Amino acid sequence: MTAAVLWKRLLLAAVFCAAPARPETLPLVFAASPGNDLYRTLAATGACARYDSPAEAVAKAPAGSGVLLLADGYPERTTPIDGPLLDRAARKRLRLYLEYPAWLPGLELGAPRATRWERTVVSSGVFGPALERLRILAIHGCRFLPVAAPNADLVAARVAGFDTAVYGLPPKDVYPILFEHPNGRLLVATTKLSQFITARYAPAGAWGPVWKHILTWLCPGRKIPDLVWTPSVRPSYSPTEKLPLDYEIQAFRRGVRWFENARMLVHPAWKRSLDDARKYPDQVGPMPDPSWPSGDGSEGLLEGFSSTIRHDGSQLVRWWLRNDCMGESSASFAFSGVIEGNRDRSKAAANLNDFIYFHSVLASGSRADPRSASFGLAGWNTTPKYYQEMDGFGVYYGDDNARSMLGTMAAAALLQSPRWDEMLLRCLLANLRTTGRLGFRGNRLDEAPLQKNGWRHYFHSERINYAPHYEAYLWATFLWAYEHTGFRPFLDRTRNAIRMTMAAYPDEWHWTNGMQQERARMLLPLAWLVRLEDTAEHRAWLRRIATDLLALQDASGAIREEIGPAGKGDYGPPQTNEAYGTNEATLIQRNGDPLCDLLYTTNFAFLGLHEASAATRESLYAEAEDRLARFLGRIQVRSQSHPELDGAWFRAFEFKRWEYWASNADAGWGAWSIETGWTQAWLTSVYGMRQLKTSLWDLTKDSQVHRHLDNLVRLMFEGERFE
């Protein structure tokens, strides 16, 4: 089934039972609340009887009919059931579908337990070709009842794979989810399957065949039409729907509004919740209450949403204050301030940068001491002892510093403020003096070894690190810094590192989650190198990387992920079922999976293509950027029931099925995660630049950071001589 056909079917009004004009209806009786997803879908035609309790439903059901005893108390309470009730059903020859039961005849049910790594896997052939054996589904927020039941149709198990459990089912810890009871005429779900809309079970298109099987079992011999419904969280447009002429400004406005609707801006009234969140595993917990006020940036901004979806369809939030996310997001607010004339958002942009550089631990302490080796650097996050005895603000990722600075550059230009110029240049120089002779800084530095070794140890080293994910955006900021200061080490070291990296491409490159993200990251420094030195060689470097990246751009505009050579990556797909969910990971299992990644690749490709187009005026980049802009406008989240998600972009999108779906193997940032910085900030910012018909390079052309160069070089490079 094509994505276009599937999408049209999912957006039909909820219809299931035979049309009212037909004399025949399905003989179904419900014991469920009137708000149950399945009941509401079936009841659209008024063809299904409903009662409040299992006992009443069994008593009122016509002989030989199908009765659905649904789990209204889920997940706190199991569905009340007993022997006499089943005896009455048997005497009436009823066929029962029973969810989350309190008791089963002849089978011992364990206490309810929650899934952690387990996903739902098709374990039989009852669903036919629509859902073949070992197909993977997601029951979000699943709590189930362990039971020993043979021949289950669906099971919960920890498995690796994108769509299919590629290593099969594990030898143990496989839990029945849907099975026919040995006594017959009783189909049991050990969890609640009927909240498939509310809890956003995925892929949405897979749950139609599940229900068709269940209802066919309940009504043998009857023709069961396909189940269709509107997902509660869905893409804004289908793959073939005509986009509005103003779709870009709509996407921009909704994307910036999302920060406020999701309560990402911390407000003083609930600031204490940040401290309370440290008790959550990995500081991931329930989202801010929608009734709480949205902040103004002065208390910082949360990292974003975790990929964990709860049984009510809400998602957990990452309660971290991260330098990169805040700096990047400040640009989004600043663009809104200019484009929409929104003074509150301009203020938020300024406040976020003030928080980073003046009012938080991120740039204070050793980072504010000129005698310290970490002087000028910005810490990764504000959490003390975030990992064992290591403080989050004592961790220095170069790429995170770089992206935060890029956001500050944009915000300063849009706000026409020199307020952060000195701090910005100080951070640029701090990163430069921890970059080696050859132009490589390495993946990250930590406070303790940095203080022990001193900055000169790194400045005079000859490390090599062919990892654009970690290196490329610092190179871009260094090229920008050279343009505005003329300080030669910014250019010389960077140009050398880029030359070495291009000579090493692709065989010696080290990839993080995939090869496409490394290519996407290289676009920005290569485009800005053309700005500084427009040579045939530099244009050829840019074209080579872009051509290889765009070789995997789908007709829809999506950029497909690709895993790099074995042995050259950090976070590849899990190689065993047991490895699933234990580390950061790519969201595909093998090359060819139709997945685009909006956290690591697509977002940075959008920015890189935009800057490449502006630098070269070549159609290759402009046309690819336009295709990507249309695609991103289509897949932006739309949801009336979850305003905290409306206007966002999830990390993963499966562009053939046109759904939010992936392997979700990443331990921290899975398929449904939303990052305020990396993703939301850059997608809205590029849309903003397209509205203003400018580029990041041109937008920031009037920066006055050079005014602070001489004093800072004397302070930070004492004893060093430069040609």
Name what the model sees in each region.
Residues A206, P244-A262, H267, R272-Y280, ...:
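Extended, well-ordered alpha-helical scaffold segments
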Residues T25-P27, D37, L69, Y97, ...:
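Extracellular ligand-binding/catalytic regions of CAZymes and related secreted enzymes
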Residues R95-P170:
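An acidic, glycine-rich "communication" segment
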Residues E562, G567, G572-N577, E625-E723:
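CBM-like carbohydrate-recognition segments
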Residues R234-L243, G327-R343, R403-R419, A472-R488, ...:
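Well-ordered alpha-helical scaffold segments within catalytic/enzyme domains
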Residues L26-E108:
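Helical hinge/lid and interdomain linker segments adjacent to catalytic or ligand-binding clefts
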Residues K223-C325, K347-D391, L425-R426, A430-N453, ...:
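Low-complexity, Ser/Thr/Pro/Gly-enriched N-terminal "stalk/linker" regions
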Residues I309-M326, V338, T383-R403, G454-E471, ...:
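Solvent-exposed loop and edge beta-strand segments that line ligand/cofactor-binding
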